Amino acid sequence: MMKHGKSEDVFKYIEKTNEKNLYRINKGLVPGMNVEGNIYVNEKLKLLIDEEIKMYQLNKCSTFLPAVIQIANVSTLPGIVKASIALPDVHAGYGFSIGNVAAFDMNNEKAVISPGGVGFDINCGVRLIRTNLFYNDIKDKQEELAQLLFNHIPVGVGSQGFILCNQNNLDDALSLGMDWSVKEGYSWIEDKLNCEDNGRSLYANSDYVSVRAKKRGITQMGTLGAGNHYAEIQIVDEIYNKKSAKLMGIEKKNQVCIMIHSGSRGLGHQIATDALIEMEKIMSKYKINVIDKQLACTPIHSPEGQNYLKAMGAACNFAWINRSSMTFLARQAFSKIFNQSPDDLDMHVIYDVSHNIAKIEEHFINGKVQNLLVHRKGSTRAFPPFHPLVPLDYQYCGQPILIGGTMGTYSYVLTGTEKAMENTFGSTCHGAGRALSRNKSRNALSYSDVLSNLKEKNISIRVASPKLIMEEAPESYKNVSEVVQTCHDSGISNKCFRLRPVAVIKG
């Protein structure tokens, strides 16, 4: 429940700071705030946040609380440090808003872990694969490529993959992550080196994944899923930092890349559901009273907290294997069309990032190094140059950050900064962020108009479910360029290069 009856009562707790694009949620907006909230938005994006508050009060919004209230609610959780942080693509979600970063002190025995701070699609993330092809090489094969990718990569709700495994293989996969993909021949060794955490969560233990979750995952390896997940053929449209782009193998405009956005499918969803049910029942044992039951949590070091961390790690490994399997299928498709090997086509993974995850990391807090459990829900890690966890290839430019746009709009590659380490626990945005609910999109937008707009932009589209055409239209989302520019201007990430889609594959 919102504490305040009028939107004006909420707005008085939100103040603009002297720092560009930074607003503060002061203590008092909701009872029991341990820290303040920080919101990174420019003036245009701030209007969308304000509108969400007003629409909720008029009962014209989703059943979720407005993002601003959710950011404040997260600040009440035990063990949170520094601030509850919202990034420019923030919007309401389950418990935590999407676009929220929150870190908890590992040395505080009361500090918590919350599945709502990770999300249901554990390790939903983005992978970018480069090629040595240019638009002129594919423009006459664009439709053929789109259809072949659609044929190769299983899409849609409940889709089943070509990468079949038995129960024993699944347990190995959940424990090993991309090491399993390399062993089975679905990944190159170089792929895992340019992947967050080398594509393997060391927390993972498949023993803590329920039988039901495993049953949901065993047939879904190498599947895209539905909703906002996609595989896109893109071309480099603009290069902002030539030195950094060159380190990623990008040197000229019109170079062809493939972007894959997917996660842990039904397996991750079931793990999140199982943990939320268990934690909601057990919170009273630890004398935890949350302001919103969707924030169900337990102490990090409790048996329940550790069980979730191990199961979540297994889901992370599944997601990395999932994106790796689709990389394998995309390489096959391109090889078939161009009659060259994927290696000859230089189909190397530039990077693979997660934007729904919780991880133990070291950060400076008040001049001291602390071990923190950083929850990133709809936000991306943004580590700077020379950070030990940044791959060797990118030590001089910082971690690549992959920002997916919307169907028919730009995507971006950014790099991490020191300011992100100082202000946002090494985090930045993850995408555009929804502006309209799926229901509103279906009611407000025309199927034929959206298809016509894509055709005008010469974008080939393949989609399993026609309703997704409206639900995933650019009008359903915030302006991704505004989101990216806000982060760039705030110094929490730097623009490197921009891509535009020429073919879109969706569930």
Curated annotation (Swiss-Prot):
<dbReference type="Pfam" id="PF01139">
    <property type="entry name" value="RtcB"/>
</dbReference>
<protein>
    <recommendedName>
        <fullName>RNA-splicing ligase RtcB homolog</fullName>
        <ecNumber>6.5.1.8</ecNumber>
    </recommendedName>
</protein>
<dbReference type="GO" id="GO:0006388">
    <property type="term" value="P:tRNA splicing, via endonucleolytic cleavage and ligation"/>
</dbReference>
<feature type="binding site">
    <location>
        <position position="261"/>
    </location>
    <ligand>
        <name>Mn(2+) 2</name>
    </ligand>
</feature>
<feature type="binding site">
    <location>
        <begin position="228"/>
        <end position="232"/>
    </location>
    <ligand>
        <name>GMP</name>
    </ligand>
</feature>
<feature type="binding site">
    <location>
        <position position="506"/>
    </location>
    <ligand>
        <name>GMP</name>
    </ligand>
</feature>
<dbReference type="InterPro" id="IPR027513">
    <property type="entry name" value="RtcB_euk"/>
</dbReference>
<feature type="binding site">
    <location>
        <begin position="404"/>
        <end position="407"/>
    </location>
    <ligand>
        <name>GMP</name>
    </ligand>
</feature>
<dbReference type="GO" id="GO:0005525">
    <property type="term" value="F:GTP binding"/>
</dbReference>
<feature type="binding site">
    <location>
        <position position="124"/>
    </location>
    <ligand>
        <name>Mn(2+) 2</name>
    </ligand>
</feature>
<keyword id="KW-0342">GTP-binding</keyword>
<dbReference type="GO" id="GO:0003972">
    <property type="term" value="F:RNA ligase (ATP) activity"/>
</dbReference>
<dbReference type="GO" id="GO:0005634">
    <property type="term" value="C:nucleus"/>
</dbReference>
<comment type="similarity">
    <text>Belongs to the RtcB family.</text>
</comment>
<feature type="binding site">
    <location>
        <begin position="430"/>
        <end position="433"/>
    </location>
    <ligand>
        <name>GMP</name>
    </ligand>
</feature>
<dbReference type="GO" id="GO:0046872">
    <property type="term" value="F:metal ion binding"/>
</dbReference>
<dbReference type="InterPro" id="IPR036025">
    <property type="entry name" value="RtcB-like_sf"/>
</dbReference>
<feature type="binding site">
    <location>
        <position position="124"/>
    </location>
    <ligand>
        <name>Mn(2+) 1</name>
    </ligand>
</feature>
<feature type="active site" description="GMP-histidine intermediate">
    <location>
        <position position="430"/>
    </location>
</feature>
<keyword id="KW-0436">Ligase</keyword>
<dbReference type="GO" id="GO:0072669">
    <property type="term" value="C:tRNA-splicing ligase complex"/>
</dbReference>
<feature type="binding site">
    <location>
        <begin position="355"/>
        <end position="356"/>
    </location>
    <ligand>
        <name>GMP</name>
    </ligand>
</feature>
<dbReference type="InterPro" id="IPR001233">
    <property type="entry name" value="RtcB"/>
</dbReference>
<feature type="binding site">
    <location>
        <position position="355"/>
    </location>
    <ligand>
        <name>Mn(2+) 2</name>
    </ligand>
</feature>
<comment type="function">
    <text>Catalytic subunit of the tRNA-splicing ligase complex that acts by directly joining spliced tRNA halves to mature-sized tRNAs by incorporating the precursor-derived splice junction phosphate into the mature tRNA as a canonical 3',5'-phosphodiester. May act as an RNA ligase with broad substrate specificity, and may function toward other RNAs.</text>
</comment>
<keyword id="KW-0819">tRNA processing</keyword>
<keyword id="KW-0479">Metal-binding</keyword>
<keyword id="KW-0547">Nucleotide-binding</keyword>
<feature type="binding site">
    <location>
        <position position="121"/>
    </location>
    <ligand>
        <name>Mn(2+) 1</name>
    </ligand>
</feature>
<dbReference type="GO" id="GO:0170057">
    <property type="term" value="F:RNA ligase (GTP) activity"/>
</dbReference>
<feature type="binding site">
    <location>
        <position position="411"/>
    </location>
    <ligand>
        <name>GMP</name>
    </ligand>
</feature>
<comment type="subunit">
    <text>Catalytic component of the tRNA-splicing ligase complex.</text>
</comment>
<keyword id="KW-0464">Manganese</keyword>
<feature type="binding site">
    <location>
        <position position="229"/>
    </location>
    <ligand>
        <name>Mn(2+) 1</name>
    </ligand>
</feature>
